[in-house]
Amino acid sequence: SIALLAMALNELGCHATSLTGWQAGFRTDRAYTKARITKLETERISSELERNRVVVVAGFQGLNKLDDITTLGRGGSDTSAVAIAAALHADRCQIFTDVEGVYTADPRKVRNTRKLDEITFDEMLELASLGAQVLNNRSVELAKKYNVELEVLSSLNPVPGTVVKEVVKD
């Protein structure tokens, strides 16, 4: 799908390139189906960006020390996106998903839930530990560590989402 997206962008006149996880520089440990990112070598991504190209990266995968392809497990694509944002010193990482943001409860299961405009990293980690599946713990922990705000947005509906950050204004 990364190659198809890059091809579609190129057809629209937007210079794009696609990279697998290992081409993008994701290095992981050896836990094949739930690997952790140990290093992100951003030279290739940076080189493409310097050439004014849109870089479409396959999330969820990397390469271990034995040059074996690994997968990051549940939420691996979100974690990959946050890792790239942190490595490139971005202020914010947008995560597009099937919901319009973070809610007080799962709107598919509970009536009268409220979408949150903002939430702290710690509050999001608490929700995730209680079963919220909007963002997984690894991506939120990484965003908190590198102070990269997360913006949860809907892939289906262009409405404001939820910003996950260090401090929320009262």
Identify the residue ranges that each predicted region occupies.
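Generic structural hydrophobic/aromatic packing signal, biased to beta-strands
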Residues: 18, 124, 150-152, 164
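Proteins with a high burden of low-complexity, intrinsically disordered sequence enriched in S/T/G/P/A and R
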Residues: 1, 6-7, 153-156, 170
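A broadly conserved detector of short glycine/acidic/proline-rich loop/turn motifs that flank catalytic sites
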Residues: 60-61, 99, 154-156, 168
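Short, solvent-exposed polar/charged micro-motifs at secondary-structure junctions
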Residues: 28-29, 161-163
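Conserved glycine-bearing catalytic or ligand-binding loops at nucleotide- and phosphate-handling centers
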Residues: 132-138, 142-160
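A conserved regulatory-domain signal marking ACT and ACT-like small-molecule sensing domains
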Residues: 163-170
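Nucleotide/pyrophosphate-binding catalytic subdomain
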Residues: 1-140
